[in-house]
Amino acid sequence: MRTPMNNDISGRPDSLNGDRSDVFSPELGEFPNADDRANDIGDMETKTGTTTVGLKTQDGTVLATDMRASLGRMVSSKDVQKVEEIHPTGALTIAGSVSAAQSLISSIRAEVRLYEARRGEDMSMEALSTLLGNFLRSGGFFIVQPILGGVDDDGPHIYSIDPAGSIIEEEYTVTGSGSQYALGVLEQQYNEDLSIEEAKTVAARSIESAVERDLASGNGINVCVVTEDGVEITQHEDFEELV
């Protein structure tokens, strides 16, 4: 810490308002290669790369994701579960930073349990989507783009939530680096009368289409079915059993 000086700064407003230096920076000099280090951390951060999709049916929702994680230009994992249960009848897919997504999921689960303990009832999907949007809008999870799928008293819901916290309820949606390939399949094959099994097939085809073209997606598929009875997540290394 700097030693207090007897300098009078009352006539020097620039000392208070004009000095934009970081108060947490070193007192002498600067951190060496600070910008380069920040860039290196970004390059070496574990990311899901990812293709994730969500579809709404009459009886529930279907979420599907690939299983690959990347570290820079390297495939860091071939067995990542990118869809997680966060509510008795709700699940969340993740695309973006793995660390931010893990923190977001833990925070949301804690808030859901607290809500249930205080009110004695499950949180609605509208309230859950708002909570997610607020978390993302806070900036702490800015590099995550989730899809929320769930069922409540008003029926099935699919929400697309962007990294800035905006919330849009959709019939179907996609996120991730392979989303443009998956979206083409969904637009051709989705309709609101799909059964759960038919929706699983369409979701698998959309993920398979992305895996064939997107380098950051691959290594199998996770499928999550959410109904009023709960959340079921299954893992498949081969697409053939689904399509």
From Swiss-Prot:
Disulfide topology: none
GO MF annotation, one: threonine-type endopeptidase activity
Description of how activity is regulated: The formation of the proteasomal ATPase PAN-20S proteasome complex, via the docking of the C-termini of PAN into the intersubunit pockets in the alpha-rings, triggers opening of the gate for substrate entry. Interconversion between the open-gate and close-gate conformations leads to a dynamic regulation of the 20S proteasome proteolysis activity.
Keyword Nuclease: no
E.C. code: 3.4.25.1
Active site, per annotation: T50 (nucleophile)
Biological process annotations from GO: proteasomal protein catabolic process
Protein location: Cytoplasm
Enzyme class: hydrolase
InterPro entries linked: Ntn_hydrolases_N, Pept_T1A_Psome_bsu_arc, Pept_T1A_subB, Proteasome_sua/b, Proteasome_suB-type
Region Disordered: start-end pairs: 1-40
Record's keyword terms, sorted: Autocatalytic cleavage, Cytoplasm, Hydrolase, Protease, Proteasome, Threonine protease, Zymogen
Keyword Protease: yes
Main location: cytoplasm
Catalyzed reaction equations: Cleavage of peptide bonds with very broad specificity
Gene3D superfamilies tied to this protein: Glutamine Phosphoribosylpyrophosphate, subunit 1, domain 1
The organism's place on the tree of life at top rank: Archaea
Gene Ontology annotations for the cellular component aspect, listed alphabetically: cytoplasm; proteasome core complex, beta-subunit complex
Assembly description: The 20S proteasome core is composed of 14 alpha and 14 beta subunits that assemble into four stacked heptameric rings, resulting in a barrel-shaped structure. The two inner rings, each composed of seven catalytic beta subunits, are sandwiched by two outer rings, each composed of seven alpha subunits. The catalytic chamber with the active sites is on the inside of the barrel. Has a gated structure, the ends of the cylinder being occluded by the N-termini of the alpha-subunits. Is capped at one or both ends by the proteasome regulatory ATPase, PAN.
NCBIfam families named in the record: arc_protsome_B
Function recorded in the entry: Component of the proteasome core, a large protease complex with broad specificity involved in protein degradation.
Similarity comment: family membership: Belongs to the peptidase T1B family.
Name by which UniProt lists this protein: Proteasome subunit beta
Organism: Haloquadratum walsbyi (strain DSM 16790 / HBSQ001)
